[in-house]
A protein has these predicted regions:
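Structural microenvironment flanking redox-active thiols in thiol-disulfide oxidoreductases
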Residues: 73-135
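Positively charged n-region of N-terminal signal peptides that target proteins for export
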Residues: 1-4
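Bacterial N-terminal signal peptides
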Residues: 6-17
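A short beta-strand-turn-helix
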Residues: 36-56
């Protein structure tokens, strides 16, 4: 009986197309090429590449920021409000900390809880300190740590396709989404 099952399994594998056996390599221009280990708000180990297969909004922030970073979150929430339930289910929102010294998973979870972020769609990530600059470079975020521990930084939402390629970017933040960027989000979700 075991031999028969093994033979059937072998035959099925032989009939599968090669694409079904191995995932295609990442595109050369994919942000997911950056192999930076991180932990999420639940302390689970992850990388950017685990977001593959789902359109993403990505930004960088830090949890102790009182001014601009809350607007980054507001911007993600405002975009979500403009989406249908089906569109929302196909979108992920990823916020990457630029302050891993202070932004441990507990700090990330406090922000997610306080802001009532749906963790089926939102992911807050803590990279290793040595990877912050590379991550910022990939997403076009400039930052500088100040003497008081705060950061000067560009604030942007970056739209990625399901393969991690940058499709669009906006620096318009707040409760009213950038209409051109929102149209790009909807287009990316429709082509998915």
């Amino acid at each position: 009986m075991n031999r028969l099952l093994a033979c059937i399994a072998f035959c099925l594998v032989m009939w599968l197309p090669p694409a079904a056996l191995a995932q295609k390599p990442l595109p050369r221009d994919s942000t997911y090429q950056l192999d930076a280990p991180m932990n999420n708000q639940s302390a689970k180990a992850t990388t950017l590449a685990t977001r593959r297969g789902r359109v993403q909004l990505v930004s960088m922030f830090y949890t102790s920021c009182r001014y601009i970073c809350p607007l980054i979150i507001d911007s993600g929430l405002a975009i979500e409000k403009k989406l249908t339930p089906a569109e929302k289910s196909r979108l992920g929102i990823t916020l990457i900390s630029m302050d891993p010294k202070r932004d441990d998973p507990a700090a990330l979870m406090r922000v997610a809880t306080r802001r009532k972020l749906d963790l089926t769609r939102w992911t807050l990530l803590r990279p290793r300190q040595q990877d912050v600059r590379a991550l910022a470079g990939v997403f076009g975020i400039r930052y500088r740590e100040l003497a008081d521990g705060e950061f000067n930084h560009t604030s942007a939402l970056v739209l990625l396709d399901a393969e991690g390629r940058i499709l669009a970017r906006t620096e318009q933040l707040g409760g009213v989404p950038d209409p051109v960027f929102l149209a790009g989000v909807k287009k990316a979700l429709a082509s998915r």
